[in-house]
């Protein structure tokens, strides 16, 4: 039929970045093997070994220590370090302030606001943005995406709000475990 995942979300080709008509015509003619290809899952161990963040998650902390059976490994947000180096703000004092702030840079007065906004941790970010990012990815994920929301003071109202927002906006699964 030439129907792709984003078609089932009600998107029209003119709203998308690329032209899909030729691919859809080829699918109509030849079909698709392994048609369910995209499922975004947590990649904790692999990402930490490679010095990346987990899948599409926001950083839970800009600096922390990963404890494993093989030893303890420091995890540092490389992009943040690069940006702070570029403006002359990455040094031992800044590193120590981030560690003292549980991985946050929000309290460091010498860090420009643009970087404070860019490098908010998962705990500092309004969770509606996490949900909106999941919705934006949804039309291009044919299986599912495994994501987390972080609440310092969770309650029934906050949790229900997140779950219902996801359901109302077409996210495929509300809970697992």
Regions found by a protein language model. Give the residues of each.
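Short glycine-cluster motifs
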Residues: 1-26
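Catalytic alpha/beta core of large soluble enzyme barrels
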Residues: 13-17, 26-177
